[in-house]
UniProtKB/Swiss-Prot annotation:
Active-site residue list: 319 (proton acceptor)
UniProt record similarity statement: Belongs to the EPSP synthase family.
Gene: aroA
Protein purpose: Catalyzes the transfer of the enolpyruvyl moiety of phosphoenolpyruvate (PEP) to the 5-hydroxyl of shikimate-3-phosphate (S3P) to produce enolpyruvyl shikimate-3-phosphate and inorganic phosphate.
Record's subunit section: Monomer.
GO CC terms in record: cytoplasm
Keywords assigned by UniProt, alphabetized: Amino-acid biosynthesis, Aromatic amino acid biosynthesis, Cytoplasm, Transferase
Descriptive protein name: 3-phosphoshikimate 1-carboxyvinyltransferase
One Gene Ontology molecular-function label: 3-phosphoshikimate 1-carboxyvinyltransferase activity
Enzyme class: transferase
GO BP annotation list: amino acid biosynthetic process; aromatic amino acid family biosynthetic process; chorismate biosynthetic process
Known catalytic reactions: 3-phosphoshikimate + phosphoenolpyruvate = 5-O-(1-carboxyvinyl)-3-phosphoshikimate + phosphate
Pathway membership, UniProt: Metabolic intermediate biosynthesis; chorismate biosynthesis; chorismate from D-erythrose 4-phosphate and phosphoenolpyruvate: step 6/7
Length: 435
């Protein structure tokens, strides 16, 4: 059995937080310094698009005291409405976060903009982007299928909105917040199922708990945002792959440093503990409103399959589900998931992608509209198994982890998507591996 060992400071910076620090920096009055900004392609796309809109952005690399490379981003802005019209279409590449959240800002600008992406992004649904922004007064045009390109004719100022978020989506919530910052009045967002709350924490928005358990977020429009520094923790979604690596080994000794432990992002740790893992955390502290700490995987493993049948839990672990599904199947032969239809609208139809590739590894799967289950394994194939990644970084990394514990040689049909969020994925695992 392979083992993996070491203390690691160089996990990728949090992808979600990196996007939001850059976007908020572009809306803030003054100089925003972001320490440990992500080098992933999605986050670099956000910077590139903001630069195309006239935002002054400088980026430099430096070595930490531990000898690891980090990036520092400095954004200079004069606040709301400081963007300028781009002379060309804005290329968002594969970044759904960029195209969706930026739409909320562009809806408030007094000019026309067109947002496009790569072949994968151009298939992703965007009607949930258009609906609230249209209600606020912007003109939004999509393709006939409701996908990009997104053509935005902004309105200054936007009208405030009372937005009830029927389908949980942190990106849609954030784009409405960004639009509401420019609105002429007070906007409210009602969130029945909580999604990741990084945007609210950065902007100092404190949700009001309602009698029915939902949360109300109140946004005052046209209020000056003063620039402030941000420090980005290590990405808990990226850490999940290394947690799974250690748990599948059962004999590893791994410490993952400075990982974000925000309760809306690290819910997978609680699930894995319920399945038998220990997974203690140490050195917990709060920086800029975000909880972070070190995750320990030491001679640890799960003893029970994961069964996920709660919409709030699904919202909390939406990005980790591919790795959790593969981990549970490989470790116990079983897995069950419901209330996760949102997975079909990610970089790929992740439900279909997981079922297809798990079946290639001999697992018995049943696919539902909102999830799937694994009910056993008919055989453990040998030889070479090709995994269809659908150019989805989380599918690619999940099955790359499985490859370390499979009788078959697992080959990814494409591993270039991994650079979207975890550029040093393979080199980091190589540095951990002891045979």
């Amino acid at each position: 059995m392979k083992t993996f060992n070491g203390t690691f400071f160089n996990l990728p910076p949090d992808k979600s937080i990196s996007h939001r620090t850059a976007l908020i920096g572009a809306l803030s009055n003054g100089i925003t310094e972001i320490t440990n900004y992500s080098a992933g392609l999605d986050n670099q796309t956000t910077l590139s698009v903001l630069q195309s809109l006239g935002v002054d952005i400088q980026q430099e690399s430096f070595l930490t005291n531990d000898g690891y490379e980090q990036r520092k981003v400095v954004i200079k802005s004069s606040g709301l409405w400081s963007l300028s019209r781009s002379k060309r279409e804005l290329m968002c590449n594969n970044s759904g976060s960029t195209i969706r959240m930026l739409s909320g800002i562009l809806a408030a600008q007094p000019f026309r903009t067109t947002l496009v992406g790569d072949h994968s992004l151009m298939k992703r649904p965007m009607r949930r982007v258009a609906e609230p922004l249209t209600q606020m007064g912007a003109s939004i045009k999509l393709s006939e299928t409701g996908a990009p390109p997104i053509e935005i004719e902004g309105k200054k100022p936007l009208s405030p909105i009372q937005f009830y978020q029927k389908i949980p989506s942190a990106q849609v919530k954030s784009l409405v917040i960004f639009a509401a910052l420019h609105a002429d009045g007070i906007s409210e967002i009602i969130e029945p199922i909580q999604t990741r709350n990084h945007t609210e924490l950065m902007l100092g928005l404190e949700p009001e708990l309602q009698p029915d358990g939902s949360r109300k977020i109140v946004i005052e429009g046209q209020k000056n945002i003063e620039a402030k520094p941000f420090t980005v923790p290590a990405d808990p979604s990226g850490a999940c792959f290394l947690v799974a690596l250690g748990l599948l080994s059962g004999k590893s000794d791994i410490r993952l440093k400075n990982v974000g432990l925000n309760h809306t992002r690290a819910g997978y740790l609680s699930l894995l503990r319920e399945a038998g893992a220990k997974l203690p955390t140490e050195n917990n502290r709060t920086i800029g409103g975000e909880l972070l700490g070190d995750i320990i995987i030491s001679n640890d493993y799960i003893t029970k399959p994961l069964r996920i049948n709660d919409a709030q839990i699904v919202s909390d672990i939406i990005d980790e589900i591919p790795m959790l599904a593969v981990l549970s199947a490989m470790a116990t032969g079983e897995f069950e998931l419901h209330h996760a239809a949102e997975l079909r609208a990610k970089e790929s139809d992740r439900i279909h992608a997981l079922v297809m590739n798990l079946q290639r590894l001999g697992f018995v799967c049943e696919e539902y509209k909102d999830g799937f289950c694994v009910t056993g394994r008919t055989h453990n194939p040998t030889g070479t198994i090709e995994i269809t990644t659908f150019y989805d970084h989380r599918i690619a990394m999940s099955f790359a982890i499985a490859g370390h514990f499979s009788n078959a040689e697992i080959q990814l049909d494409d591993n270039s998507s991994i650079a979207v969020s975890f550029p040093n994925f393979f080199s980091l695992i190589d540095s951990m591996q002891k045979t």
